[in-house]
Amino acid sequence: SQLMFLQSIISPWLAENLINAYPNVVNDVANGTLKEIDYDLVKGVREFTWNKIKEKIINNYLISDIITMLKPLGVTYTMIKKLLFDEPNPVLLKQQLEDNPYLLTKINGLGFKKVDNLALKLKPEFINSTERLVAFIKYYFTDLGDSKGHTWCSVKILKSAISNNVPECVDKVDWLLENNEFLHIEDDKVGLKYYYDIEMQIYNLLLEKSK
């Protein structure tokens, strides 16, 4: 796990060279027991580079557990920054991710399927959960907005998308449509309340300007 952590903050070959010479380098630097290294033992590292590496280890050490857990997804420190903005405490963030891995759908570029695969490995019991259904619906509408410029669809189309992507959650759809605070439903149209509120703000601003 120390190698995985190092590879997420410095180049993979450099991480391997360091680990080969100092197998416990991450813990030792974080604990303050390793301040200097023998540069002859580590190819490609001199004083300036070593100081930069030490700084990165210390800054990222608190989130090393999270980085190691999410490395199979290709999650980097930069991606985790968005989650840390919402929850700055790494210990609490890790707990939240373990409780509901679908929080990762907040990270741009991961996509629902990648997150879903990891989430079901961490929490197989989430296969037919409300958390999984909510995460898919939020992702579906965000993707719809980004790729096609639409912020809503018919209830029928949404149900079809759910059936095709998270069929195990189908029996929770009707309940969720009636008991949620994140969707706006009008007649047969459904979309994220967040988008609806923004559109209404823009509409009201334009209305005011036209007077």
Language model features with spans:
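Long, highly charged, low-complexity intrinsically disordered interaction regions
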Residues: S1-R132, Y139
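Conserved NTP-handling cores and scaffolds of large molecular machines
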Residues: V26, I57, Y61, F141-G145, ...
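Intrinsically disordered or highly flexible coil/loop and linker segments, enriched in small
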Residues: I63, T76-M79, D146-H150, E168, ...
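Short amphipathic alpha-helical interface segments
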Residues: V134-W152
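Short acidic, hydrophobic short linear motifs in intrinsically disordered regions
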Residues: K148-S163
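ASCE P-loop NTPase motor cores of helicases and related translocases
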Residues: W152, E186-K211
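Charge-enriched amphipathic alpha-helical scaffolds
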Residues: S163-D187
